[in-house]
Amino acid sequence: SENIEAIEFLKRVNEIVHSEHAGAITVAEESTTFAGVTKPVAEGGLGFDFKWNLGWMHDTLDYLKEDPINRKYHHNKMTFPSMFQFTEKFMLVYSHDEVVHGKSPMVGKMGSGYWDDKIATLRALYAYMWMWPGKKTLFMGDEIAQGHEWRYDESLEWSLLKYIQHEGVRRVVSDAAKLYLEDPKLA
């Protein structure tokens, strides 16, 4: 069942934000199949500008956690998100939720193998992410392949950039972001 009061509240919040703060965006972290999250309120939607594509995030991570030799049996995890890609205005996201509480840093999610293999897979993931339609966001430290989970009371491991593998991840993210800004088809 739907909570009608909550739905109306979200619609009203989005109407107020958009009418009183030109250029502001609202983003929904919403993992159900509730339709119309990013549809305008005037058209019966909730009026959010974007919705996190949590399905894409979970499917890609599930695929990349597989041992590389077994990934051929799981290609559907990489293709399934295209089935609903244009049902909402999605934002691809790897958030803080994915790099805390024993879940490991992003590089630790890249299947089995040597560290260099994991770093290469992470670079491939970020290139794939930036070439997939929609807006993107990474959590701090993801762009340098931070070696440990996020710790709110510590700085990022900027010293990792002296290593070519970590600098390579940073460069892929930077180059992909530049391409994204230059080519509207990627947005």
Q: Where are the language model's segments positioned?
A:
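Catalytic cores of secreted or luminal carbohydrate-active enzymes
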Residues: I164-L186
